[in-house]
């Protein structure tokens, strides 16, 4: 498995890039599993008292590949296909000698440990270890002739998360917990083969599928603040309506402030005359010039609005009437106090 990822070493230097691990799972539909179990019950009941059920085969297939993306290059590793096939030999059922004895339950557990190591010229990335555990528990066939078998439950749990560690940084992805529970109704045992076959095909109404996914998302902003969000999505539906979903109602409340402030900038320009007199003997000369004085004021205007509770007319008003209190700014008189001496 490790040799297949050496194709990622084509680049001499790979920067720390997002670590992506994809799973493509192939799952047999619940209807096929239920039919297979029912057919097995039909075969065993139609045989003689010393006949044996057919072999039971469980196949699990996982397709894996890794994609590493740098600034301008994408490296895709080879595709690994992990296939696990388990064949069990059922215990013979002898109806003539063990009519009242119940066989022990049969439990099959399959565990797969997965991790990926990516090595560049100076950095080694090691992912976390994923443990995929599948447990299959089946109720052995009872030896009685008319008693009904108990339900069959299949539970599959997958814990997924990825941790990428470089020389000084550790990246941890969210943790996903995927749990699937499949419960099927066992076929009723009778002496008549035709009656049992009919029950296996018509009385499969106890099938329930439950899927629960828990996701943990960590968000870090530019200031270094970290927020952890947990989202649980669960859906339960019967076999008769696989597309059923529960609607969600979202209520949004908006509250408006009754007081608002507006800041305005006022620029005032005033021309001030400057006069100078020069006297030489009996001659007086007067010089007059104009100087522009500019001042800037910041004015804050506050207005308060309120909605009338009722209106004087009898007609229904589609738009409420608002009352405003206005403030008037007095005429501006620049405080000019200048003294010129020539």
From Swiss-Prot:
Residues 1-16 form the signal peptide. Residues 315-342 form a propeptide. Keywords: Cell membrane, Glycoprotein, GPI-anchor, Lipoprotein, Membrane, Signal. One of its GO terms (cellular component) is side of membrane. It is found in: Cell membrane. A lipid is attached at residue 314 (GPI-anchor amidated glycine). It is a lipid-anchor; GPI-anchor. Induction: Expression is induced during infection of reconstituted human oral epithelium. Expression is repressed by HOG1 and regulated by TEC1, EGF1, NTD80, ROB1, BRG1, and SSN6. This is Predicted GPI-anchored protein 54.
